[in-house]
Amino acid sequence: MATVREKAVSLNLCATYSPAQRPPGPNGSHRPFRATYIWSSIIQALTQVEVKKRRHHLKYHHDCFIGSEAVDVVFAHLVQHKYFGDTEIPRSKVVRVCQALMDCKVFEPIVTACMFGREKKRTVFEDSSCSLYRFINNSSHLGAQVEKSNGRCTPQRPKHSSFQSAPLKSPSLEDLWDNLSLTAADPTHINLTANLPPKVVGEVWQEQTIRRLLQLVDLPLLDSLLEYTPVAPRIPQVKEEELNLTSNYLDREILKAFSDAQADEWVSAAVDCLDFLPDHMVVDVSRNLPEQQAPDSKWKLLLFDTIGKHYQNRSPLLRNQLFDIHTGIAELLVNGKNEPALEATQLCLKLLDSPSREEFRRLLYFMALAADPSEFRLHEETDNRMTVKRMFSRAVVCNKNLSKGKCDLLVLFILDHHKDVFKIPGSLHKMVSDKLVAIQQGSDPDRDTGYTFCQRVDKREFDSATQNNTRTELCALLKTIYENTSLSPKEKKRLLGQFYKSHPETFIQYFGDRVSSVYT
């Protein structure tokens, strides 16, 4: 007669009821331990990050993703599925989660740091658009392993994945959550529903991005924002298999080989921008490359002038359809509100289509390198930062209704924060999560979403704001009348007299001791 162990082996019950594959729960689904499930779902979500060929530090790297985008994906997953209830999750703690995943070999950094003549891989995960990572490939089947000696769960790739994960040598997963000051929610409340269609998720992201923008920026009209639809880039990128068939492919390859031969990140970033230039400009650059003996200034100026010429003659990357948003961000900067301005800029860039975001990211990275005062001097009489601003302002934002001062302020602000402007704000993650959960649960998705267009204030604060705003606008009107050179002296005196009769206190406050000389 067969023993119980033999029957279990014949029915493969060990695999079915292992810690990685627990017996069915009350709802009939197979669920692993809660911590193991959370880690597995995080790793599975991370595989949705955009992976493609990228160029960095003078080399091309295949199948890479950006550190900041990995944080965005994990952040969105944690907030959307509410593993920790309604607890607010700072971005810095999501970075620590990514650090733990890198420590246990889910992915690895591909950018190396040179120390004392030796290359050494970075050990600290960087939430940056300049840091590249790659999943570790292995054909081994992976599951959630449990260290029986201390009960620690190890995050591993799902069995259908081809990524390998080594045992976690840091504290257990439960300890990691405690160290992050995050309390896991009731497992019965964890969102295990199927994913929504990508179209629905995309519409929610755009809707909530606009909603958050309206909370940060005062807009006179909403039509342009509410009717906004991403526009395809003017110069579409050519597929790699089609690019091989064009006569200009060789010129682009020559430029890439030329930049590879130069130990200069400046040149590498410039050549990356050439991918978005038309063929005839790339051909001109390729066939006018200087000789090897030529000084750096000659070919760097050639690249800088070519890229600048292209972007001076095309529409800005921050499209004029969102002009009111750009004006609002500039007003925030004028008033010294840098944090809201940065978040509004991040939201504005989130509305761009993916090709435009990638083009802007490359251009901004090149601008930041070229603006560095320690880099090659672009102009003899002007520092690099001002030269870059003057050359590429039209490429970033250009509208005749936005004053030059505010335009320059906005461009320099984006340039100074080029490492942060492509990150997704945590507030947007929370808003998108709440909306998606409401849709999945079948409840009203627009209920309890916070104010969008106004905020309730008490009567005293309202009256004070009304008086201050009225006084400010009256002073602005008085200044316009007094400094308007197109008005004749007689007409100006008449208008000032009318203003004095209607608002004598504001008139006296503005002119002070000069009242008699101005009014008479």
Swiss-Prot record:
Gene3D superfamilies, per database record: Winged helix-like DNA-binding domain superfamily/Winged helix DNA-binding domain
Any one Pfam family match given in the protein's UniProt record, by short name: DEP
Gene Ontology biological-process entries: intracellular signal transduction
Spans annotated as Disordered: 148-167
Residue span(s) of domain DEP: 45-137
InterPro entries cross-referenced by the UniProt entry: DEP_dom (IPR000591), WH-like_DNA-bd_sf (IPR036388), WH_DNA-bd_sf (IPR036390)
Family note: Belongs to the DEPDC7 family.
Protein name, UniProt field: DEP domain-containing protein 7
Organism: Xenopus tropicalis
